[in-house]
Every structure is written in structure tokens, then in C-alpha cells.
UniProtKB/Swiss-Prot annotation:
Family matches, as HAMAP family: MoaA_B
Protein name as it appears in the record: GTP 3',8-cyclase
Taxonomic placement: Bacteria, Bacillati, Bacillota, Bacilli, Bacillales
Biological source species: Listeria innocua serovar 6a (strain ATCC BAA-680 / CLIP 11262)
Cofactor(s) needed: [4Fe-4S] cluster
Domain Radical SAM core: from-to ranges: 7-221
Amino acid sequence: MQLLKDKFGRVHDYIRISVTDRCNLRCVYCMPEEGLTFLPHEKVLSKDEIVSFMELMVKFGIKKVRITGGEPLLRTDIVEIVRGLGAIPEIEDISITTNAMYLAKKAEALKEAGLTRVNISLDSLHADRFQAITRGGRLQKVLDGIQKAEEVGLFPIKLNVVLIKGQNDDEITDFLQFTKDKDINIRFIEYMPIGHAGTSWKEKYLPLDTIFKACDDASFEYEPVDSIRGNGPSENFRIKGAKGTFGVIHPVSAHFCDSCNRLRLTADGYIKACLYWDEEMNIRPFIHEPVKLMQLVQKAIDNKPENHEMALKLQDEVQSNKPTWRRMSQIGG
């Protein structure tokens, strides 16, 4: 099997597929509140195009898929997309990232279709604050979604918490306490300068050393834990006696580019080898031309930089490439 390897020796076996750029929320770090233009439906990859693409990609070593958006559960055919991917025997793991507003309704059908596990965005445990950060989200719907995911067996359940200075950094201890009572993995993620968030991100950025300080201040004893299924770049820990775990993902303060194994496919059919850089290849016209398609995929991988240089932006230093101005919802979070 010919593997998808870049010039730094990194083998790519994981892809994140965005199935929509639309979302029912407007999280402050992801999308502006208004003035948005979304892709016309005919510009979005169809279920058949996604499945055909993956039937080819598995022949080159891709074996893990994460479905993203926008909010993927807005797709009326999301269960059929999962079912189509689940029918490809080489795919070992199918996961989804969701805001969970519709998860309680769809978790059982998604599990039956072949979904393996779920990541849920949850940036506050206080209903009013959660509504403010998401510009309209209802915390109880997320909690109901978590419960339903537990009931149907979508394990491990991971909660993604973007740490935002002055907005939710006073809840770190509450999130850590949450892991004591539930068998879930809470992942604290540094605020990143992507798209819309890139203009004001320094005001909201906190390094993830803040998490460990909060543990120490609360007298929580913690220790590293072995790899959690699908843990990716997360460094994981367990508070003594806790049922669950917590992790830290620090793309800015300590990048993990040397072990990056992922590609991204946008909802409109562009391959991106690096989340941060602007370069992307339009593969949609060649979905049914495997030779040309794989040439473009390999070209994207060949052009992948050694690292994303987000830390240089933190220091106002010059970067070697042009950062993306796509929103996270347009790339696929």
C-alpha cells in the first residue's frame, strides 16, 4: 500500500471531513454574529461524493474519519453519510464533533449507522454564560446529548472546552470536578488565531499552564494516563479518584506538528493539509478521476509545512506562509 507521507516523514492516516459550513449557533471564537454568507447547497459535497472519496482514500492508508462542520447534525442525511462510511471495511474509527443541540434525538440512529464516538463542544457549565458564548445555545440540550451518548455507547465521550480569557477561565475547577463524577474526557483547547478569531485572539488567549495551576490551587492530585482512544494531540491526566480524565491541547504554546497525521476536507471539496495555512486543493471536480485526485492530495501533502507557526503570531513575528482567512466553520473544526 502506498501511504500518504510528507517530506518530513509524517504518515497521514486520519481525515476530518466537513459536511457543512452552516451552524445553528454563533460561538464567539468560530463565527461572527451576523453578515455570514453560506455555501449554496449545490456547492456542498453530497453523501455519494464523500463516500466515493473515502473509498479511494482508504487505499492509501486513511483509516480514521472525523465528521465536522459547521454543525454536522444539521445535515438531513447525516445518518446516511455515517452509514456509507461505516460500510467501508478499512475505516476503523468514525467520530463526529458536534454542539450536541440535536444529539439526544440522533445519537441512537448514528450509533446504529456505525458512529464510533463523539466530541461535544461545551465551553461553560453555566446556562447563561453558555448561551452568551454560543449566542443562543441551551446548556440543557448539551447535557441531554451527553446522557444519550452514554446510553447508546458512543465511547469515549470527549468534551471540547476552548479556554477564553475573561469568559470561562474561572470555570476550570468546575470542569475538572465534572470529571470526578462522569467517565468522560474533558479537553481544554487553547484559543487559536483562525479566521474570524484571528483579529482579537490575543485578548482572549491563555496558555494551558493555567489548567495545571488551577489543579494546584484546588489541591487536586493528578497524574498522566495512557492513551485514550482517538486522543490525537491531547495530553491526558486523571485527578486522583476521578471516573473521567482531562486533557490539554496546546497548538499555540507548544505545537504538536511533528506528529501531525491528519488531512482536512472542506464542505465544498478542498483538501487542506494544515489547519492554519491558506493553501488548499480543489478535489471535487476529480472525485471520479482517481489518478488526478490522488495527485492533488499528494501535492497538498508535499506542500505541508513543518509547523504552523501560530506561536510567531503570538509574538508579532513574521511568518513564512500566509495564514488562512477561512472561518473554523468553513474549514471544519
